């Protein structure tokens, strides 16, 4: 198994096991070589049937929620716009589940390659850092994983049912509400699965940056030709490892593109849908779920903020490399050493061309700048939606006065 080769994956696999229970990702134990091939085949066959059952459950939940939306629209006699928005939002349950299952099926080998690349990168980094005393502070990755992923997972799973159960209305049965909660939590956990891989990349970047800083300290005091050549070889190795991290980020981005794209779309549309119903219930009917709806919208936004924040931190750590290279150039004991000058030039050119972006299929970048733009867009649509509702209510009242 790849977890036996990588400490990072060994600490991330418990979270990935949880995601596999929700049929978001294949079981991590299914990757790698094992002598029990027949047992592995049986387990994977069972998991395929389990994932199919989850998909069928999502279809059922989506269908009956659409029926409930139609009944609620007829009961309250609201506009067809509310019906269309609600049906699209509920249909995204099925669309997101189909996209995720197809992504698992089509990109199964790619995900296995990502695990292998992470394990190989960690092993090569440990080997490259041995002459500098090895890597330090290994416990920090486990702490960051628990703080960023584990704590938010507990808060979200614990709070979502309390906030959304009542707001589903009387047209949804208790059993259907429970299944709907399961589907909603399942879809939101996709963001945390993405965060796990971002944290792994972030840890690899931090380790490589630490090694480069140690190289910079060695260059300050080194004047012997043989030692300078050895340090230049280590610098070149650091450059190649950073290029492999850049390629790893590209593979991770390609794997998560369809599901993260739909998650951003779903959360944005859900916020608009909940604001729409909050407005309807506030001004037309008596509602008891105003604060719950606000907290749900905040939860959906935080669940989008988390991957953007972690990606931005990783980008910032990656962008520190040119500054360290500049320090090496300025503080080296022999800055005119030809091999060092050539190595620094090649490294700097690589940093100019290989930018860490965490792009979502080239449509947008997952970072704080995009999240700010997303907030502006959502608030803009909310303002348009409220203006549309105010005009509709004013027109109806005018007709009543005239009649």
From Swiss-Prot:
Q: Where are the transmembrane segments?
A: 12-32, 49-69, 84-104, 145-165, 192-212, 260-280, 366-386
The protein's GO terms of the molecular function aspect are: ligand-gated monoatomic ion channel activity
Segments in the Cytoplasmic topological domain: 1-11, 70-83, 166-191, 281-365
Q: Does the keyword NAD apply?
A: no
Show the Pfam families listed in the entry.
7tm_7
Provide the topology term for how it sits in the membrane.
Answer: Multi-pass membrane protein
| Keyword Electron transport applies | no
Example GO biological process term? sensory perception of taste
Keywords for the protein's UniProt record, in alphabetical order? Cell membrane, Membrane, Receptor, Transducer, Transmembrane, Transmembrane helix
Q: What is its main location?
A: membrane
Give GO cellular component annotations, separated by semicolons. Answer: axon; dendrite; membrane; neuronal cell body; plasma membrane
Q: Where in the cell is it found?
A: Cell membrane
In this entry, the parts of the chain located on the Extracellular side of the membrane are: 33-48, 105-144, 213-259, 387-403
Specify the superkingdom.
Eukaryota
**Protein function:** Probable gustatory receptor which mediates acceptance or avoidance behavior, depending on its substrates.
Q: To which protein family does this belong?
A: Belongs to the insect chemoreceptor superfamily. Gustatory receptor (GR) family. Gr2a subfamily.
Protein name (record):
Putative gustatory receptor 98b
What is the name of the gene encoding this protein?
Answer: Gr98b
């Amino acid at each position: 198994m790849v977890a036996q080769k990588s400490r990072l994956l060994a600490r991330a696999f418990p979270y990935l096991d949880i995601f596999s229970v929700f049929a978001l990702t294949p079981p991590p134990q299914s990757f790698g070589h094992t002598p029990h091939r027949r047992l592995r085949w049986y387990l994977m066959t069972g998991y395929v049937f389990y994932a199919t059952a989850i998909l069928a459950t999502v279809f059922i939940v989506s269908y009956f929620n659409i029926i409930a939306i139609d009944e609620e629209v007829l009961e309250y006699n609201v506009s067809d716009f509310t019906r269309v928005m609600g049906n699209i939002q509920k249909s995204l349950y099925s669309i997101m589940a189909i996209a995720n299952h197809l992504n698992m099926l089509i990109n199964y080998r790619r995900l296995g390659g990502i695990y292998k690349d992470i394990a190989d990168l960690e092993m090569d980094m440990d080997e490259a850092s041995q002459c500098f005393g090895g890597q330090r502070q290994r416990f920090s990755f486990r702490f960051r994983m628990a703080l960023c992923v584990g704590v938010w997972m507990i808060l979200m799973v614990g709070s979502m049912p309390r906030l959304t159960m009542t707001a589903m209305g009387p047209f949804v049965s208790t059993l259907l509400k429970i299944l709907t909660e399961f589907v909603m939590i399942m879809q939101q956990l996709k963001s945390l699965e993405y965060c796990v891989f971002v944290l792994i990349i972030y840890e690899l970047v931090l380790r490589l940056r630490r090694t480069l800083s140690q190289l910079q300290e060695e260059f300050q005091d080194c004047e012997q030709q043989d030692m300078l050549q050895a340090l230049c070889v280590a610098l070149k190795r650091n450059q190649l490892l950073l290029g492999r991290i850049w390629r790893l980020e590209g593979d991770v981005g390609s794997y998560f593109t369809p599901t993260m794209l739909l998650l951003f779309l779903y959360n944005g549309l859900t916020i608009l849908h909940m604001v729409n119903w909050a407005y309807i219930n506030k001004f037309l009917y008596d509602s008891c779920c105003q604060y719950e709806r606000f907290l749900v919208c905040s939860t959906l936004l935080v669940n989008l903020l988390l991957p953007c924040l972690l990606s931005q931190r990783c980008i910032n750590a990656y962008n520190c490399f040119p500054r360290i290279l500049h320090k090496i150039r300025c503080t080296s004991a022999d800055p005119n050493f030809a091999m060092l000058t050539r190595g620094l030039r090649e490294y700097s050119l690589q940093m100019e061309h290989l930018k860490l972006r965490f792009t979502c299929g080239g449509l947008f970048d997952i970072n704080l700048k995009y999240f700010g733009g997303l907030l502006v867009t959502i608030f803009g649509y909310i303002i348009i939606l409220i203006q549309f509702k105010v005009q509709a209510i004013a027109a109806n009242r005018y007709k009543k006065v005239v009649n």
